Amino acid sequence: MKALEINNLSFGYKDSEKLIVDDLSFDINKNEFVTIIAPSGTGKSTLFRLILGLLKPQKGNINILKDGNKNIIGYMPQKDSLMPWRNILDNTAVGLELNGYSKKEARKVAATYFEGFGLKGTEKYYPHELSGGMRQRASFLRAIVNNPSIILLDEPFSSLDALTRRKMQSWLLDLCQRQSNTVFMITHDIEEALLLSDRILICTELPYRNLKSIDVNIERPRNYETTLSSEFIELKRDILNVLDSLEENKGGI
């Protein structure tokens, strides 16, 4: 079953003659973790804004698996974007409130996730009182508490220091291995993509037209020892070769 289908999608901003996306088609299966890799500044976040409905394509369509009568998308941006005037529990419950839950009901549902997300005890804290990693956990919980059809992660750990980023990657890896979610992630970190993903899409030309799909056939559960395996290193080499070829063909991006 397809969680996301993109068919012949084209888009360009009005103040530019160039298209960012040109007749692009791909899909993501339900409960699949897919990552797209491309250099920074090439329009990956624009693709997410199209999926979220914040931008309207000039051509093509986007189909998202519906949950009953709802078409719910979870979104986690690069920065946590938590509301500073709300405590952590109220921040994580806001999506439920927007979908018709009373504040009391929303808090009750959100609170059931706190222990599994390593957030137990932070319910009454405010965002400025937590570390960057803990704020990102709360942001991810806010993205999935509605049980969305698909979760979009826009370079979720890029703003964190290297040590915290590694801890958060391990946490997300463990979380995704314990529960089934459909995830579409943007990153330029090849190791992060290989560690977390079932499949990786690589931009092979600009504007976005053809995406090379690479299956990450590395056994789960995975951990950081996985990054030292011959399979992992070989896949990383393959991806680097594709990206190097793109740079050479386009004279750099």
What is the predicted function of each stretch?
Residues 104-122, 174:
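Conserved ABC ATPase "signature" region
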Residues 151-154:
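Catalytic Walker B motif of ABC-type/P-loop ATPase nucleotide-binding domains
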Residues 60-71:
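Conserved ABC transporter NBD signature motif
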Residues 37-39:
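The feature captures the beta-strand-to-loop junction immediately N-terminal to the Walker
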Residues 52:
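Helix-to-loop junction immediately C-terminal to a conserved catalytic motif
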Residues 140:
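Hydrophobic anchor residue at the start of the ABC signature
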Residues 125-128, 146:
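Conserved signature/switch motifs of ABC ATPase nucleotide-binding domains
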